[in-house]
Regions:
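Catalytic machinery of carbohydrate-active enzymes
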Residues: 2-407
Length: 407
């Protein structure tokens, strides 16, 4: 084990089990499920689903500690170490799809530089299917045994990358930040040309995890109708795991064209990844699927509101971008907020929707407000999202020009 280590930022639960066990998340491909291996102890993040909902009530399980920290290689050593024949375990900070796509792209660059390194990820959780696109990468979606941990010479906490602490208020590009930190050249990109023809497969993914980044239903309906009128096969993919999905689907109305279908969502992230890989063109909100297009260089249009398209797309030019141009008395797009925030007296929103300065919105909401979320995505969107709807004609014109469509 190398010297000059320090504790990981996040704490892990250290537990033992007298009985064999296996565990897999419902939205992850079954083949990535994990099983015990008779190790004396195991480790999982203290805030993971496994720790919070399973271990505390499981027979034969003993929690040894909830304050365990791995000894990890410090950030200032990442670019100096030689990983040529090393075994490296990367701790994944969270399972947000966009961030994990960036980390997957970084791992491609890492293995391009160190093809004989043995690599693994821990805490990939719901994003495990994304990491599974890398051949021979070991994936520990929720826990690792002491036996497996002992195989790794280096443990690296990726939350030490620049900008991670502030990612909730100012998005970063993990691929760019990590390649710079490890002094790696990113993998070359293959260009996929846009070629419209009847029968083309077009995927539209309008929903993000936040109302700040979800596209107006009326805009999505207009885009879908445009493509359908030119004999494209259009699939609108919603997210059944989000509480606002039914309301959003109702707001789309009756898209009667036979070549438009609406999918409530996919069972696993692996199914979503496969869907993106098979599309000829995509229209996406600032969401995980927008980032997944980078893995296949799928061409399309990314429509952005609160986050910067330039920051999120980085070097990837497969998506043409449209950025909300909203300017108001308290903010202008892109403001950098990834999620709704709360005022000290509990009002939930953003600077534009609440007409307050950014300094007033210092906290994330302590509890969800489903009714507010439904209103924001269907009836009264935040100003930067509403501006996208107001510019629908210009967005349609851009699509017509790029895909050489007549009116």
């Amino acid at each position: 084990m190398p010297r000059h280590l320090h504790p990981s930022r996040k704490t892990f639960a250290r537990f033992a089990s007298r009985q064999p066990f296996q565990f897999g998340l419902p939205n992850v491909s079954p083949e990535l499920a994990q099983a015990s291996d008779n190790s004396p102890v195991y480790f999982t993040r203290t805030n993971s689903l496994l720790r919070q909902q399973v271990l505390g009530n499981a027979k034969g399980v003993a929690i040894k500690s909830d304050a365990f920290r791995f000894q990890v290689l410090p950030r200032d050593c990442w670019g100096k170490a030689d990983f040529s024949k090393s075994s490296v375990l990367f701790l994944i900070p969270d399972d947000a799809l966009g961030d994990c796509v960036g980390m997957t792209l970084f791992l491609r660059a890492f293995l391009q530089r160190y093809p004989h390194a043995k690599t693994a990820v821990l805490n990939s959780a719901a994003a495990s299917d994304i990491f599974a696109l890398i051949p021979d990468l070991a994936i520990f979606q929720l826990f690792i045994s002491a036996r497996n941990l002992a195989q790794f010479e280096y443990v690296i906490d990726l939350s030490e990358m620049e900008g991670w602490k502030d990612i909730a208020t100012m998005p970063v590009n993990p691929e760019e930040a990590l390649c710079e930190a490890f002094e790696l050249a990113p993998v070359p990109l293959e260009k996929r040309d846009v070629s419209f023809k009847p029968g083309i497969n077009i995927g539209i993914v309008p929903m993000a995890s936040s109302p700040l980044r979800t596209l107006p239903p009326e805009l999505v309906g207009k885009i879908s109708t445009l493509f359908a009128r030119h004999d494209a096969n259009v699939t609108i993919v919603l997210n059944a795991y989000q509480g606002v999905m039914k309301a959003y689907k109702a707001a789309l109305g009756d898209l009667a064209a036979p070549n438009i279908r609406i999918v409530d969502g996919f069972k696993t992230i692996g199914d979503l990844v496969q869907f993106v890989s098979k599309q000829d063109y995509m229209v996406v909100a600032d969401s995980g699927p927008a980032h997944i297009t980078k893995l296949f260089q799928t061409p399309g249009l990314g429509i952005y509101s609160s986050a910067s398209a330039k920051t999120l797309q980085g070097r990837h030019q497969n998506l043409r971008s449209w950025q909300s141009g909203f300017v108001g008395p308290y903010c202008q797009a892109p403001c950098g907020l990834a999620k709704l925030r709360a005022t000290p007296d509990g009002k939930i929103g953003c600077m534009g929707s609440l007409n307050v300065a950014a300094s007033v919105l210092s906290e994330l909401p302590q509890k969800s407000d489903p009714a507010l979320a439904r209103t924001l995505v269907t009836e009264n969107p935040v100003p930067c999202v509403a501006e996208l709807g107001q510019k629908s004609d210009a967005i349609l014109s851009l699509l017509k020009t790029e895909l050489s469509l007549d009116s």
